[in-house]
Amino acid sequence: MVNFAYYMFLLLIIFLSFFTLKRNLEVSPKKIKIYLTFVITLFLLRHIGLFMLCILQSSNIIYYLKPIIYLNHIAMPLIVLAITYVYLRSEVLKFTGSYVVLSIVVLIYIYIIRISKLTIEVSQNYGFIADISNENSMYLFSLILMGILLILNVILLDKPYANKTGIWFIIVSIVVVMMEEVIILGGIKVFPYSVIGELIFLIIINFVFNGFKRSKMN
């Protein structure tokens, strides 16, 4: 039953990623549309890769999936950054700085992946399970990013025009994701890979889209 739940999570996230991409192209303001398209695509690629690990009959192709298996560690912080910007409701702050952050985060991710060796295990319930030698470093990198964003959102609660309800959603979601990652670092895994955090943030970004009007500047 646990493996069935894992497959359902993967398929749900893949479907929701396609749905979210479509909504992003329809309603997002131009200044964040390209950014969100890139980040949501990271979610999509990662979960297609995880689903392929479940159904592949040969391990030959798994080495090509290495760069996308851990994309959640950068996709979640990057999407939190975008959601925070929207809920801040600042007319002065430019979103272009987020593209700089995106570039730096992606470069660090590429570096960690490049220096990591891949090991493959076979699971009766989950198919192939691929791990990298620097997995703990990847989790720590993600935790640092999420920790910074958590502090930022707590600070933003005092801003006069900020969407405080939305920011509270972000804070609670970040705490849930960080707890999940700490539990995994402690060696406790319900599923072979974390999937709960991605689902939470895909749902939140769709709530953000509900606040966008189609008539906004595109």
Which residue ranges define each predicted feature?
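C-terminal transmembrane-bundle signature of multipass membrane proteins
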Residues: L145-N218
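Hydrophobic alpha-helical transmembrane segments of multi-pass membrane proteins
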Residues: F9-F15, I32-L56, A75, F169-L185
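Juxtamembrane "helix-exit" motif on the non-cytosolic side of transmembrane helices
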Residues: F51-N60, I112-V122, M179-K189
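Membrane-interfacial loop-to-transmembrane alpha-helix junctions, especially the N-terminal start
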Residues: E26-L42, V92-V100, Y161-V172, V195-I196, ...
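Hydrophobic transmembrane alpha-helical segments in integral membrane proteins
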Residues: M1-L16, S133-L143
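Membrane-proximal helix-loop-helix units in multi-pass membrane proteins
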Residues: Y87-L149
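Internal transmembrane alpha-helix with an interfacial aromatic "cap," most often the third helix
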Residues: S17-L25, F51-I62, P67-L102
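Non-cytosolic membrane-interface motifs at loop->transmembrane helix junctions
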Residues: S59-Y70, N125-S133, K189-I200
